[in-house]
């Protein structure tokens, strides 16, 4: 019997498996199993589909237990700025602390989400990398008035991103602007020094 947890089409489809419990057997999948442990996995681009999925999980997990932490694992190249801010606002809105952990990479929008985890609960694995830069822009066209509107919106998004990163890293918005004028790539240790994370996790095998 399926547990009803559907993996979005944007995700790589992983095989389901049968799990034995005191109540019998049930069909499940890795994402559903992680969800049961209050773990959300962002392993795709940040877009409207992944944002809606993550926001729904955050809200459901809050409803299930508003006082128990949620963990978000991140391995993402980034993506849409509006989708980023939708996830960000939901992370700040829900009552549970959201712990963030970078596996692989957290680039662009995903780096902001990594930094937005609860203070003291942001981490990365030793070989993870973090990339920050100004919000990407697409080619603009149209009348002069349209271009002015688009330019103003691009500047608004950039200032919002700088303010958000400043709030979570302790860097000034001015320093964030300088650092994100071009791609800034950080190792896990570099992200720790920059204030994007609070710790670099050791491998579990080393602690056994």
From Swiss-Prot:
SUPFAM superfamilies: ClpP/crotonase
Source species of the chain: Corynebacterium efficiens (strain DSM 44549 / YS-314 / AJ 12310 / JCM 11189 / NBRC 100395)
Catalytic activity: Hydrolysis of proteins to small peptides in the presence of ATP and magnesium. alpha-casein is the usual test substrate. In the absence of ATP, only oligopeptides shorter than five residues are hydrolyzed (such as succinyl-Leu-Tyr-|-NHMec, and Leu-Tyr-Leu-|-Tyr-Trp, in which cleavage of the -Tyr-|-Leu- and -Tyr-|-Trp bonds also occurs)
Function of the protein: Cleaves peptides in various proteins in a process that requires ATP hydrolysis. Has a chymotrypsin-like activity. Plays a major role in the degradation of misfolded proteins.
Protein name, as recorded: ATP-dependent Clp protease proteolytic subunit 1
Family membership noted in the UniProt record: Belongs to the peptidase S14 family.
NCBIfam families noted in UniProt: PRK00277.1 (NF001368), PRK12553.1 (NF009205)
Keywords, ordered alphabetically: Cytoplasm, Hydrolase, Protease, Serine protease
């Amino acid at each position: 019997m399926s547990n009803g947890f559907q993996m979005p089409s944007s995700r790589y489809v992983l095989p389901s498996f049968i799990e034995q419990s005191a109540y019998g057997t049930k069909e499940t999948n890795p994402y559903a199993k992680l969800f049961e442990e209050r773990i959300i996995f962002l392993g795709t681009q940040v877009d409207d589909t992944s944002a809606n999925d993550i926001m729904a999980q955050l809200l459901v997990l809050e409803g299930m237990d508003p006082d128990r932490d949620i963990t978000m694992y991140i391995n993402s190249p980034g993506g849409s700025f509006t989708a980023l801010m939708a996830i960000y606002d939901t992370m700040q809105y829900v009552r549970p602390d959201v712990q963030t952990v970078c596996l692989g990479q957290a680039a662009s929008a995903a780096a902001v989400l990594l930094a937005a985890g609860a203070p003291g609960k942001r981490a990365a694995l030793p070989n993870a990398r973090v990339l920050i830069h100004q919000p990407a822009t697409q080619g603009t066209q149209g009348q002069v008035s349209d271009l002015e509107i688009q330019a103003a919106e691009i500047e608004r998004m950039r200032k919002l991103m700088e303010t958000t990163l400043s709030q979570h890293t302790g860097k000034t918005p001015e320093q964030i602007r300088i650092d994100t004028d071009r791609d800034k790539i950080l190792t896990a240790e570099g992200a720790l020094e920059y204030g994007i994370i609070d710790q670099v996790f050791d491998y579990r095998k080393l602690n056994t």
